[in-house]
Structure formats: structure tokens, C-alpha cells
Design a protein with these regions (language model features):
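Bacterial N-terminal signal peptides that target proteins for export
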Residues: 1-11
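Exported/periplasmic ABC-transporter solute-binding proteins
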Residues: 4-5, 22-64, 74-75, 79-82, ...
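Bacterial N-terminal signal peptides
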Residues: 9-20
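Pocket-flanking alpha-helical
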Residues: 75-106, 211
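Short, glycine-/small- and polar/acidic-enriched structural segments
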Residues: 88, 95, 110-113, 118-120
Length: 304
């Protein structure tokens, strides 16, 4: 039997493998990701987690896509976004000019899409008789002035959007050392208030509108307080109607910020949230959609 030389064959096989590897390396990283297909991750302000979970669940059921949700405090979310831990984020504010410069240096222009109006809610133990609270009293408490109606303010995280929002409102740079309690999540805040009378919790309202099965018994033990705005006379609860009429004083817009720089799932998910289906999900969640979904009314010519 004639034997073929082994070395040329091995050499040829090696060249073939190198060629194949080079072709694989030259493929675009995002080749398998489109606006409605593939996988990605989304950074989420923890105070907004429930509405994002609802949106992602439906999006994944409709498209061949997988979105990993990474809940963090607002400060941690923005830091992770700037470090490319993920290139999509959902926040209760836009990026400021300094934050946008980080992406400009990478030749990426963040695309910001507003999709809902949320609210910061004050909650108390259900055993508390008072269901009203004046925003001025809360501001004064944040400035170190004691108030007989407020035993303590309970926040989710020192780096959270609720803390940043309330500090900006009060004109303070940091929370006072006395009468302030903080945890890691909104769930922990709700549970602490449910177990302690006299405490006022500060949470994202979407944690209260459609609580999980685990949280429902706990939410049943708290009261969502109606708030009187600074310089106002009437009290308003954080309902969809009051948000729409701009009566509730602690409303805030929600944004999805896409820093992918290409046509990927960030673009597709943003379009979904701001579109018909996403806005219906927002409406059902208890938040205020940017665009009120239309209703199809069938008119019958004859009544049977």
C-alpha cells in the first residue's frame, strides 16, 4: 500500500484551522443580535424594577430575545453604564452633560426614550391613623428639624434615586444623621414600615400598585399617604389620574437610555416599551403611560 507523507497533510490541516479561526474572529460581535433577536442585559434603577420586569416578560414572550435585568441603585447604575457593564439602562432621570461626555468620547450618542410617569410615594404603618402628610414637613425633617408626626424617614439606599430626588427637593447635599434609616431594597423598606409604627417609608410607587405574591401580605399592612405640595392646600394620592393632571407633587418621568451605538436589542426594547403593547403594560401597572393606548370599539348595525 502506498503511504502518503503525513507532514504536508498536518500542515494543510493547520492552515485550514487557522483560516477558520480568523474568519470567526472577524465576525461582528453583534452579528447575532438584532432589534428583536439575541440577548443583552439592562441596568435598572431598583426603585423601578417591577415595571421593567413586566415589560421584559412580555417582550421575551413575543420575540426570540433574552434580556437579563440587573437592578442597582441609581448611582451604581450610571457608574456601570459608563464602564460598559451594560449599554442599556432604565432610570428616573436623563444623563447629565458630564455623563454624556463619557459616551461622546467613545463616539456614542445615547438615545433617550421617555416611556412613563412614575411617582415617589410616602407610606406608613396601617395602624397609624393619619393618612395625610405635608411635603414641607418632610423637607424640614431632611433639614434636621424634628416633627412630631415623623418618627423617622426610611429610604432604600443612600445612593438611590429616591434619596437623590428628595435631597434635590430639600436643597440638601446629604441626609441628616438622626431619624434616617436606609436599607438595600424597596422591599425591605416596605417590610420595615409594616412592622414599625411612626415610620414614613419613601419608595417607588410601582412597588405598591401590583406587588408580587410574596409582598402582597406586607403591602396590605401599609398605607399610601396623600401628599400636600409645598405652598399648596390640597392633598393628593399618587394615582394615575392625579399624575395625569399633574396634581401629585412627587411625580417623575422614566427613561430607557440606549448606549449600544448600533441597531440592537436596546433599540428594539425601547421601541417596544414606548409602543402600543408597552404602553398598555404601563397603564395596567398603575403608572402613567406617555401615550394613552387606544381602544377598539366595535359598533354593531343591529341589536339582537
Amino acid at each position: 500500500m502506498k503511504k502518503f507523507p503525513l507532514i504536508p497533510f498536518v500542515f494543510f490541516l493547520g492552515l485550514l484551522l487557522v483560516f477558520f479561526a480568523c474568519n470567526q474572529n472577524n465576525k461582528p460581535k453583534n452579528e447575532e443580535e438584532t432589534i428583536l433577536k439575541g440577548s443583552t442585559s439592562v441596568l435598572v434603577d431598583e426603585t423601578l424594577l417591577p415595571i421593567v420586569e413586566d415589560q421584559v416578560e412580555v417582550f421575551e414572550s413575543l420575540y426570540d430575545a433574552k434580556i437579563q435585568i440587573n437592578p442597582k441603585s441609581e448611582a451604581e447604575t450610571i457608574l456601570a453604564l459608563s464602564k460598559d457593564t451594560s449599554k442599556i439602562a432604565i432610570l428616573s432621570r436623563k444623563l447629565n452633560p458630564e455623563e454624556e461626555k463619557v459616551f461622546s468620547s467613545k463616539k456614542i450618542k445615547p438615545r433617550t426614550t421617555v416611556f412613563a410617569t412614575d411617582a415617589i410615594a410616602f407610606i406608613s404603618n396601617q395602624r397609624n391613623k393619619d393618612t395625610l402628610i405635608a411635603l414641607q414637613d418632610v423637607v424640614n425633617f431632611l433639614k434636621g428639624m424634628p416633627n412630631s408626626k415623623i418618627k423617622g424617614l426610611v429610604f432604600d439606599n443612600p445612593n438611590s434615586s429616591t434619596v437623590r430626588y428628595m435631597n434635590e427637593l430639600a436643597g440638601t447635599k446629604e441626609l441628616p444623621s438622626k431619624g434616617i434609616f436606609s436599607f438595600k431594597t424597596n422591599e425591605e423598606v416596605i417590610q420595615f414600615v409594616a412592622e414599625n409604627e411612626g415610620m414614613i417609608g419613601v419608595v417607588g410607587v410601582n412597588w405598591l400598585m401590583e406587588p408580587s405574591l410574596k409582598m402582597r401580605p406586607i403591602v396590605d399592612k401599609i398605607t399610601i399617604l396623600s401628599v400636600k405640595g409645598i405652598g399648596k392646600t390640597d392633598y393628593f394620592a399618587p394615582t394615575q389620574n392625579n399624575l395625569a393632571e399633574k396634581k401629585y407633587p412627587l411625580a417623575r418621568e422614566l427613561y430607557i437610555i440606549n448606549c449600544q451605538g448600533y441597531s440592537g436589542l436596546g433599540m428594539g426594547f425601547a421601541s417596544f416599551i414606548a409602543g402600543e403593547v408597552g404602553q398598555r403594560i404601563t397603564l395596567k401597572s398603575g403608572l402613567l403611560p406617555v401615550k394613552m393606548p387606544g381602544r377598539n370599539i366595535k359598533v354593531r348595525k343591529q341589536i339582537k
